[in-house]
Amino acid sequence: MSRKFHFLQMKLNGKGANMLRKKMLRTFWLYKVQFISMILMVMLGIGMFTCFNIEWKSIEYNMFSLFKNSNYADYRLINSNGFSEEDLNNILDIKGVKNASRFITINADVNEKSGDTVAISITTNFDVSSFVLIDGEKYNKNSDDGIWLSDQYAKKNKISIGDSLSFTYNNIKIKGRVRGLIKAGEQMICVSDKTQIMPDFKSHGFAYISPSLYEGTLGFPYYPNINVLSNIDAKTFSKEADKALGNTNLIIPKEDTLSYSQAEGEVSEGKAMGSILPALFLLIALLTMISTMHRLTVKEKSQIGTLKALGFHDSKIVLHYTSLAFIISSLGSILGIALGYFLAWIIMNPKGMMGTYLDLPEWKLVSPWYCYPLIIIIIFTLTFIGYLSVRNMLKGTASEALSPYIPKKVKPMLIEKTKIFKLIPFGTRWNLRDIVRHKTRTAMSLVGIIGCTIITIASFGIKETMNDFLDVYYENGLNYSSKIYLSENASDDERFDIIKRYNGDYGASTNVKLKEKNVNLDIYNLENGKIQTIDKNSKKFKIKNHGAYICMRISEKFNLHEGDTFSISPYGGNEKFDMVVNGIFRSTSENIIISDKYAQKLNIPYKIDSVYTDVKKDDIALSNIIKSVHSKKMIMDSFEVFLSIMNNMLYLYVAGALVLGIIVLYNLGTMSYVERYREMATLKVVGFRDKKIGKILYNQNLLISIIGIIIGIPLGILTLSSMLKSLASEYEMKMSIGIPSYLFTIILTLSMSLFVSGMIARKNRKIDMVEALKYQE
């Protein structure tokens, strides 16, 4: 008998399991809109979060991979007089130095391409500061004509392996043949000088030639750099190097080089962007998902009671509904990861946004270690929320579970007790009562609108801040047509002859030590106003002759303010010069600015190395005095590319925020429509037309949207401020949000909310008044 009962129980259990599977499919179909919207919410939240975290991690991974494969130097010793073979051996004798090489990079004009320049590098040891071969012959240090050219420059200018090329530097012609196409860590961000933001391989590239070709053309070995591979800390290495060479030399750690610092800046920027805005996407999606899951189980209360009455054990009912939450969160997470990788690939590929900035041989997508554990935690959390929601509905007997869900009684609002309340239109009163009764739904709608507003205003704010910075610093700050670079061998008379001939302002740049920090000291004579400097309030000022001007980063790092005194030490000597801080300015690099008269007053030695003139580049002839000429147009063209990349990133954020906002509000609106179905049917019975009911719904969403915008805009400004602080190590920008940004944010957010309201209001036409009013009886 017991065996028959056991067999019958097994049979019933099998049928029960099959019934639950069918019910799950019916539930998915019945609530398909809610389930699809929840999946999309999780997908968007995780997709945006993973995308921007993959971006910075991939930059970091591929950057270090190139640095390792091209033997990127840890330190660079610089001496304008050059280093001998004996100097190199003295550095190699330092304990902890792995390898070293004499090195030089020169900017030369390409004779076959008028106006083009190429940074030519020569290393005496290929195991230090070399390159990665993409195509062609291996490097040969004894080659008399070998040129290993940037593959990007070759592609943009249709240059092939085997083609002849010639360059001119300081009136010296270097001839050779392209033996290979390469990428190099030293030129990962290939720009002609520090004023250019974005690479332009159409007009500027890089190449390596052999020491044999270089020394044979020049006639003697001149190497102003020794590049070093070492794990010694910067302070110790500096002391040991000075001791080995017998004097103080300029030593630049890799962290201060252009390629390394700019790439690190991109990583830091990516971390900041990936930890603030995408986190908001994730938070909005999760909060709304939790609310929706709870309300779905409330809607299923009678179904839960029916299953309980049929004899299904609580554990099976719990497993059934918890499985729904698990499937939704898992499917949304899988799709989110796929979306994240897809968006990251759009950004991180040779033809993508970052491909125009970084010159990398490998574009592997890498995710930070914490992304997948976090996604697992999210799936577990959402599943657990589903479990708690259904567990709450199972309390009590089957008959109690079968009874319809009754919202808790809400106390009358204070305003309801006043005479004013009776004067308020019926629709407004109805909306106020509904908002108070359904606080959670209202709160989630507010979260969606606030989040959308924060992301939108922050994105537009970044765009406007960057545009203003570039406009003030470059468009209006650089008032010259061409920048002339003078030869190191030119005499003072020859330099002043060029200044007079082209009626230009002039400057000199040298590296100095401020405490243990290497910074640029820029000395200017700007009588013609060819360069304008801006203070920390983004206002132009003239450089005076009785003090120094320091950038904001130096001011903050060394706690220096106007009137303070500080000391600098030029490399190659033991002198110290005391300076008074005359002002603080915004800059794209860590530098100090003084006038030529103040430099002469302090007896600071310098050589004029650049002239700023209104004469066009094509009208300036190269000579043994003028080594190269750059036009302002080259710099401004690079900004267009930079702004295009930045704008695409920000548009992606705004589009994602609007899509997420629409999904969140539509999901909550649909659930709200289901909850208020009977109330709206009652309104139809007493004579309200569909248009009038729709207007009531519009007004409620409009009220919530306005409140969300009012709260979201200040929070968005705080978010933008936080992001700018995290980017302060790379840019010294003043936050700028104009009226257009506010208007666009308000219009987009309201349009999104009203669009969703319209979609929900259209459902009023399908209300069955008889069925709705007798449903709970």
Whereabouts are the PLM-identified features?
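Feature of multi-pass inner-membrane transport and sensor proteins
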Residues: 1-37, 299-303, 309, 313-316, ...
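Membrane transport/envelope proteins' first extracytoplasmic loop
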Residues: 3-286, 295, 354, 469, ...
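Alpha-helical membrane-protein architecture signal
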Residues: 21-25, 36, 256-259, 315-319, ...
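Interfacial "coupling" helices/loops that link adjacent transmembrane helices in transporter permeases
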Residues: 31, 287-327, 663-703
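Juxtamembrane segments of multi-pass membrane proteins
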Residues: 76-77, 426-557, 561-564, 568-570, ...
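Conserved G/P- and acidic residue-centered "switch" motifs that form tight phosphate/ATP-binding loops
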Residues: 136, 162, 311, 336, ...
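Small-residue-rich transmembrane alpha-helices
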Residues: 246, 290-295, 300-302, 326-359, ...
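C-terminal transmembrane helical bundles of large multi-pass transporters
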Residues: 608-611, 622-744, 750, 756-759, ...
